Amino acid sequence: MASPAASSVRPPRPKKEPQTLVIPKNAAEEQKLKLERLMKNPDKAVPIPEKMSEWAPRPPPEFVRDVMGSSAGAGSGEFHVYRHLRRREYQRQDYMDAMAEKQKLDAEFQKRLEKNKIAAEEQTAKRRKKRQKLKEKKLLAKKMKLEQKKQEGPGQPKEQGSSSSAEASGTEEEEEVPSFTMGR
């Protein structure tokens, strides 16, 4: 057997570094502390709690043996049984009414969402069409200007060309002026 003195000699356990006690003053600090603790050991799996299932009443009993009424004899234990069954049934009906109301509200919300989406798409299409029209107008004016420069030719005097181009650009400027200004 080994001597008791030899078995009690162990290397000392590594000591944990002391952690400072930090009391979070607000939700942001609390979140920061939780993140720091998670990031100390990134290999460790993070426990993600599952969504709690919504409360639902027990389904009604498939078979009720003794159907008793509220007029059970005074002092009998039957009244309590009736009362509990009635309470559960009312609870179940209230739950079904609440779920029907919730489904109705969800359906209305989805309809409103779809309606808003369609309206937004129509507005976007209208604006896109307007932008495209303005762009085409600018391109057309640019082409007209280039054609006029080509038609003038190098042989004509610059004074006449500049006056005719000034007249042409004046009409073009009137055409180019948009009915609205963007970004104001």
UniProtKB/Swiss-Prot annotation:
Its main location: nucleus. It is found in: Nucleus; Nucleus, Nucleolus. Residues 1-10, 159-169 have a biased composition (Low complexity). GO terms for cellular component: extracellular exosome; nucleolus; nucleoplasm; spliceosomal complex. It comes from the Eukaryota. Residues 51-143 are annotated as: Required for RNA-binding. One of its GO terms (molecular function) is protein kinase inhibitor activity. InterPro entries: Prkrip1. Required for pre-mRNA splicing as component of the spliceosome. Binds double-stranded RNA. Inhibits EIF2AK2 kinase activity. Belongs to the PRKRIP1 family. This is PRKR-interacting protein 1. It comes from Homo sapiens. The gene is PRKRIP1.
